């Protein structure tokens, strides 16, 4: 006698196996209903360990159950095709559940790793922000100190300019000293070298010697000319008429020009 579950219509599922319209209890799916006993109770026969192992090996090979494969397994294992179909259906559901658990565990592990990286990056970010803030504070302090020092330096020269000179020297002394230094600097480069000065002195001395010799020569000529004229006058007075007349009427020799009126050629002799 068949169980009520065996009388339910069956439909093929998407995986190629056989499914029922209503959900059945696992024990009822795994059991085979027998005839009624003396106690009036319904006996159930469960699958043996060998049958379960054979079905597991077949499921690991292919989790989809084809009609020909279902009939062959039922014939080889001494089961009804309905029992084979129900076992594959339940086994596939458990496999999907375990697959979801494995996927969840993998995703959870990835999530934990990403969360740890995220926390580490957040800590690094906070540390960098704190360092940037500290550096900005130091930079601001340095800028403030630099501006303060610059203002102080600008104020110090102004105060020193406003104070009178402490030495008591005239205010124009610095300008005169600077101008004197500039004048000395302008004059010193134009001084002749010692060799040039010696040459100039030697040339001036030579010119002086030549000029002195020329003056002596002209003086001597002028002196001799005057002596000759005095001798002629003396002879005229002493009675030398001829000499006197001759000397008186004779063409008077022009005296030589003084040394300062003579031609310039004699200066070079």
Swiss-Prot record:
Tissue: Expressed in leaf blades and panicles.
Keyword Glycosyltransferase attached: no
Record-linked InterPro entries: HD, HDZip_class_I_plant, Homeobox_CS, Homeodomain-like_sf, HTH_motif, Leu_zip_homeo
Any one GO molecular function term: sequence-specific DNA binding
Pfam families referenced in this protein's UniProt entry, alphabetically: HALZ (PF02183), Homeodomain (PF00046)
Region (Disordered): 143-180
Subcellular location: Nucleus
Keywords: DNA-binding, Homeobox, Nucleus, Transcription, Transcription regulation
DNA bind region: 40-99
UniProt induction comment: Down-regulated in leaves by drought stress.
Residue numbers spanned by region Leucine-zipper: 98-142
The protein's name: Homeobox-leucine zipper protein HOX20
Organism, scientific name: Oryza sativa subsp. indica
